[in-house]
Each structure stands twice: as C-alpha cells, then as structure tokens.
Amino acid sequence: LDGLREATAGANRITGQQKLEGKFDDVKLPYLGYADYQGGGVELKTKWDKGAGTDKPAASSLPKEIMWSHLTQIAGYWHMTDVWPTIVYANRLGYRVFKPTLEQLQAGVAAIREACMRRERLLAAASSPEELLRLCDPQWDHMYVWRDLPPAILEQAHKIWRS
C-alpha cells in the first residue's frame, strides 16, 4: 500500500481498473489496455515470493529499472491518455516506484506500433484462424501459456501447428 500511496500522492480521488482504447498511426485496429489505477497513471506490479508453498519462502527481488514488457504497457496507456505513468513494483518486504523518461515512453510506443502493424499483416495474410496460428511461433516452452490446459486442448493445438 505504501507504494500506491506514494504513486497517487496528491490525488483527490483514486480510481481503479479502467479499460483504455486508442489508435496508432498506420494501424487500423484499435489498441486496448486495462490500466490499474488513475486512468493509466499508475500501474502496480506485484512480485510474489519464490517457494511460497514451502517452509522457506523467499521474497522475489524488485527490479532496479522498469522491465521492458511493463514499459511498453504503460507507454501504450500514455499514448492513449496523455497521462504520464508511474509504475510501482511491490513485494512483501517493500516497493519501488519508477517514472519513465520521455525517451523510454517514445521507444515503448514505437515498439507497440510496430507489433500492431505486424499483427495486422499476419491477419491479412491468413485465410483462416488455423492458418493465422500456423504463422505464429507457438512458444511451447513458455512458462505458463500451455501449462495447465486440458489434454484435449493441447492435442488440438499440436495438430494445428504440426500440420
């Protein structure tokens, strides 16, 4: 809570999650995001204990700078709202608050725009959902995307990508 208090200091009212929608130059489809607090002005990232289910849990470390995936997220919110974002990283021992630079935000917006344009090209190139999936890397080794899916879903995914 201390990190959120610091990030929202001076606010007369604190607002929770809000759906944001905007556009990027040369991108036809809308860009969507769900901001945590203050209409995109404050994003909270929690770092949970490692080994939480054991008798020796260890607090995950807090980053020393904004992580790239989180920077692109808040840069998208900034692009849509013109609200300068703050990001709070918190674990059970403490927190860190970061405000990105203009250069960081601009780099994040450029990366989002490029990714959106690439996705639109993939959508245009595919004639079916299955073909679209085959154009993408399934990332079978991703740490959580495929982890807890029912076997029937995994089997269907393997059929799509391996055909």
Where are these regions (language model features)?
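Short, catalytically relevant binding-site loops at active-site mouths
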Residues: 22-23, 48-50, 93-94
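Metal-dependent nuclease catalytic regions and adjoining charged, substrate-binding loops involved
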Residues: 64-66, 76-163
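Short secondary-structure capping micro-motifs at structural edges
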Residues: 23-25, 73-76
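A short acidic, glycine-rich active-site loop
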Residues: 59-71
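Extracellular structured ligand-interaction cores
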Residues: 32-34, 71, 82
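Metal-dependent nuclease catalytic cores that hydrolyze phosphodiester bonds in DNA/RNA
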Residues: 1-40
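Conserved catalytic cores of phosphodiester-cleaving nucleases, focusing on short active-site segments
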Residues: 16, 33-61, 76-77
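Short, structured patches in soluble enzyme cores that scaffold and shape functional sites
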Residues: 18-20, 44-46, 89-91
